[in-house]
Each structure stands twice: as C-alpha cells, then as structure tokens.
Amino acid sequence: MMMKGTVTHQESFLNRIAESLGRERRKSGVSLPEWKYQPQYQTHAGCTEDDLVTMLKDHCVNIHTELIETDAAGLYDALRTQVNRFEGGPVIIPKDSRFETYGLQTLMTEEWPDEGIPVWEWDAEQGAKNIEKAEQANVGITFSEITLAESATVVLYASEHAGRSVSLLPTTYIAIIPKSSIVPRMTQASDILKQQIRDGVTVPSCINYITGPSNSADIEMDLVVGVHGPVKAAYILVNDR
C-alpha cells in the first residue's frame, strides 16, 4: 500500500511566486476559463456504441493486439482458449469481484490449478511476493475500467488489490473489456475521472493507460516488442456487459 505523503513549504513557495509576479496571492475568485473552441468534444461525437467497437477493432490491428468478441456466457471459453494460445500459466490476477460476477471464479480457483496452471490472486498482505509472482507469470489478466476506442487503450486503476505489476511484468497480457466501458477517446476518460472526483469518489493515485503490448523503437525506427512490458496482448470484448 502506498504511504500517505505530506506537503511542506507549500505556502511559502506560492507566496514567493506571487511576489515574483508583483502581485498578492490569489486565494479566491479564481475559476476555470470557458474556452470558446473545444474541438475535442466534437471528435467522434456522432459515433454509436457499435461504431466505437468497429473503431476499437480497427486500431487493434495497428497495435498488434488480437481482439476476441464474445458475450458473458461465452467469456469462460474465450478466456480459457486465449490463455492456451499464450501457452498457459502461471497466471496472475488482481483481487477483483468481477471474476466471480462474470462466472470465472471456478476457472481461477479450481479448474486451472487442477490442470497444473497456477493462479496467483494479488494479496496486499503478501507485499513484495506479489511482484515476484508477477515476474514469474506467463499471463496477467485484468478488467478494463475505461476503454478508448480511438487508440485501443485500456485504462486500469491501481490499488492495494490490483498492483500495476499484474499487467506490466507477465510475458503476455489479457484485458477483459465490457462493451459499456468503451468511450471515444481520452477526452471522455478524463471527464469520467473528473466526475468521480466531484462525486467524492477516491480516485486512484496510479491510473494506467495501456495500448497493446510493449512497443519501443530506436533512432533507426526498428520496432522492438516486449522491452517495457508484455510481448503479446489480447483483448476480450464482452458485448453484453
């Protein structure tokens, strides 16, 4: 769990800036400007849910990520098949009640372990052992909180029950994407987070935007995959969730 930080010398720092600007500190009466032009809200404004799915599919091709479409009833088989295609376990998952809600709990806790596929569920009390398990894992599996159709990006919230290592350190990565999580682009994702803050929801201090497998390029534009994360990634789109 991340330690709570403290802010020191904030007042003196801000006072010094105001003094350098030749004015008094403004502590009230400051509001966000109303921008005359906000083209970000017009981009993809007329897209339907199905249009966004098509956009997501098309961009998955560009980022070398396979997208599998299914429904809630077919998710079990789709996930099992994809893990087999990634050559099995070990598997690591966050502590997330959606695995049970989506009918995957038996697969995680009984069937895969009985078949010799270890499954590690993130356990905050185990500390650094979670990172060791993530390093040893062949497949990391998470749910996408928000999905950006324009860039085929999944958004993950890190927490004490879902460390960043789950999607970063395994050799391969699978994101389960509820169709209802798809939005056009970063604009809408930012609005969702801002609304959560206005509603008093505690927003995670670590929010990760993941676009397919790890891709890097050197100065000669030679693509190298897997240097900073998984070598392969797949998205499983659940059409009725």
Curated annotation (Swiss-Prot):
Pfam families: LUD_dom (PF02589). One of its GO terms (biological process) is lactate metabolic process. Belongs to the LutC/YkgG family. Is involved in L-lactate degradation and allows cells to grow with lactate as the sole carbon source. This is Lactate utilization protein C. It comes from Bacillus velezensis (strain DSM 23117 / BGSC 10A6 / LMG 26770 / FZB42).
